[in-house]
Amino acid sequence: PERIFHKFNWNIGDREQTNFDSDDEDIVAAKVSEEEEVYQKIKDEFGFDPVRMYYLPENMKFQEGTIFREMQNAQIIYSDNKNKILRYQIAMDYKDSSIGLDIEDQLIQKKELEIEKVPIEIKYYKVNNSGQTHINAIFKHKDIQYFLSGNNIEEEEFEKILRNLKFF
């Protein structure tokens, strides 16, 4: 069947986003998402484009984003509304601050990946007495520190997220 597409150009900051709409009901018009707005606010507030995730596991969706101006950091949370949670923290002035972690879980594995010449340290944990898993990744890019934490996300999925990071 013939479909008619309408092309829309959105300007988001200095980036252009092209969306397509269709007269067919099974194709939904794309719009600027809350997630994109959070990334744009980070850019506007702190003056840089943060590393972005271009892959999420199935059913994982953006939940909320918070910018802490005084602490010079931002946090973005994704969830599948069941038991999978992904927390992404961006620390602009990490030399003068720290991200505190109190991990009492058992460290199972530690390894390093290199994505676009950026070393990423990954630690895998078993959550005590629950059988659930927890994975942390930490890396630095252009003097910004990034921390990605996942609960109940499979190792392969977590690493796929990392392999699909977009560095600006």
Question: For each predicted feature, which ranges?
Answer:
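Surface-exposed amphipathic alpha-helical segments
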Residues: 142-168
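Generic low-polarity alpha-helical segments
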Residues: 4, 35, 48, 162-164
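Exposed alpha-helical structural elements
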Residues: 3, 37-41, 157-160
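Membrane-interface helical sensory segment of bacterial ECF anti-sigma factor regulators
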Residues: 1-18
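Short, solvent-exposed recognition patches
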Residues: 19-136
